Amino acid sequence: MKNTSKFQNVVIATIVGWLVLFVFLPNLMIIATSFLTRDDTDFVKLVFTLDNYSRLLDPLYFDVLLHSLNMALIATIACLVLGYPFAWFLARLPQKVRPLLLFLLIVPFWTNSLIRIYGLKIFLSTKGYLNEFLLWLGVIDTPVRIMFTPGAVIVGLVYILLPFMVMPLYSSIEKLDKPLLEAARDLGASKLQTFIRIIIPLTMPGIIAGCLLVMLPAMGLFYVSDLMGGAKNLLIGNVIKSQFLNIRDWPFGSATSITLTVVMGLMLLIYWRASRLLNKKVELE
């Protein structure tokens, strides 16, 4: 028992040390840097200021933040519209077939997402496979310009993040009480009524979880907008990357990072509150 207790203490200490060293301290440094002043020679000057946060209210950066939220919201809705039917179909398949499709859903995670975006870029380019196929069918006379548009960024985000929507939806749909659906049918409820009044409320935890898993990273995937959207379709992640790597304005980059983290934290808080309300509603019913 003593050896087991010592081993547990070592494991816990290792995990805590890892979190402190690679999560807590770096975030603390970013928070501290966000209140300092930029210096052209040493990157950071130890002079306290709030200008880095006030600059975020500048129309240039504020518009990028709103644009990021808008693009993330559209990508989330698209993932939900595409992911819900797929998750429903997956949950209704025979038990023997599901593992294969789940495996195919997870396989893309084995490949770096940046490589997959490069592949999608080639596929959607003016001389790519999609345009060549449409020209061969006679649907179009000249290649359609898809790349470097907001639509291309949305396609890229959906392509990368769709599995994150499907998995929690599949988990919620799989747990649906079939006798409850049969009872609704016996009582004369139509398929639409059953879907709206029973299925959606019961799968709402999966919907909320999937939306968060898609929307939170969607605002920061700077390489998707870089490769698919170009300079005119920036996300807030592009601003952060540019401030740290190109402009070398670390204080403002830190302030932008903290702001994005706070926005994500508020979304998580909304999810937590919504989950509690849903659980209370289910308990009352």
Residue ranges and their predicted role:
Residues 2-6, 10, 36, 170-185, ...:
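C-terminal transmembrane helix and the adjacent membrane-cytosol boundary/short C-terminal tail
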Residues 1-4, 74-106, 122, 180-181, ...:
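Transmembrane-helix boundary motif in ABC transporter permease subunits
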Residues 24-61, 123, 127-128, 230, ...:
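Short membrane-interfacial helix/loop motifs at transmembrane-helix boundaries
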Residues 2-8, 53-60, 218, 226-273:
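Interhelical loop and adjacent transmembrane-helix boundary motif
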Residues 41, 50, 117-158, 192, ...:
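Membrane-interfacial helix termini and adjacent extracytoplasmic/periplasmic loops
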Residues 26-33, 38-39, 115-117, 165-168, ...:
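Non-cytoplasmic
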Residues 1-30, 99, 103, 261:
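N-terminal signal-anchor/first transmembrane alpha helix
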Residues 15-24, 103, 107, 159, ...:
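Transmembrane alpha-helices
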